[in-house]
Amino acid sequence: MERIFLIGARASGKTTAGRILAEKLGWRCADTDEMVQRRAGCSIADMVARDGWPVFREAEAGALQAACALTRVVVSTGGGMVLRADNRAALREGGIVFYLCAPAAVLASRLVLDPVVSQRPSLTGGNPAAEIAAVLAERDTLYRETAHHVVDACQPAAAVAGQMLRLLAAAG
C-alpha cells in the first residue's frame, strides 16, 4: 500500500481527516482541489466561472494522475472526482480508497460553517441544502462502487481517521 485516497461529498471531512490520517501514518498528505488551485493560480470557483466545468474536470484528472505518482501519501479528492470512469479506475488501482459517507443534512450543516464556502462553485445553482442532497443522491453509488471501504463521516475528523486506521490494520 503506497497511497490512500479519500472520496466523498463536499464537507465530508476528507481534507481534515486526511491530514490526521497522514500524520498518524507518518505519510504526506495531498489534496487534489489544492493541487488544481495552485496550478490554475485561482480558486476553483473562479476557474469554473472563467473556463467552465469541463476544463476544471480535466485539471482535476491531471491532479489525480500527479497524486498517483506519489508514494506514502494520503490524497483527499474533490467531491466530483468519481464522475469520470477513468478517475474511478485510477483511484481503485492506485491505492486504498475510503468513502467518507455522511447524510446530506450533516453535509449541509457543515457547509454553512465552512469558511471557504465562497471558493466552492455551485454545482446546481440551487440553495446549498437542496444542492448537497441532489448531488449526493447522484454520486453515492459512484462513491460506493469506487471505495474499498465506507466509513461513517458523521463523527469528528479524528474519529474518522481512527476508523480508517482500524480498517487498514484489519486488512493487514
Swiss-Prot record:
Catalysis: reaction(s): shikimate + ATP = 3-phosphoshikimate + ADP + H(+)
Keywords associated with the record: Amino-acid biosynthesis, Aromatic amino acid biosynthesis, ATP-binding, Cytoplasm, Kinase, Nucleotide-binding, Transferase
PANTHER family listed in its UniProt record: SHIKIMATE KINASE, SHIKIMATE KINASE 2
GO MF term set: ATP binding; magnesium ion binding; shikimate kinase activity
Annotated family: Belongs to the shikimate kinase family.
NCBIfam families in the record: PRK03731.1 (NF002988)
Name assigned to this protein: Shikimate kinase
Amino-acid positions noted as binding ATP in the UniProt annotation, renumbered to this chain: 8-15
Record organism: Oleidesulfovibrio alaskensis (strain ATCC BAA-1058 / DSM 17464 / G20)
Alphabetical GO biological process terms: amino acid biosynthetic process; aromatic amino acid family biosynthetic process; chorismate biosynthetic process
Listed EC numbers: 2.7.1.71
Localization terms from the record: Cytoplasm
A GO-annotated cellular component: cytosol
InterPro entries membership: P-loop_NTPase, Shikimate/glucono_kinase, Shikimate_kinase/TSH1, Shikimate_kinase_CS
Pathway(s) the chain acts in: Metabolic intermediate biosynthesis; chorismate biosynthesis; chorismate from D-erythrose 4-phosphate and phosphoenolpyruvate: step 5/7
Keyword Nucleotide-binding in record: yes
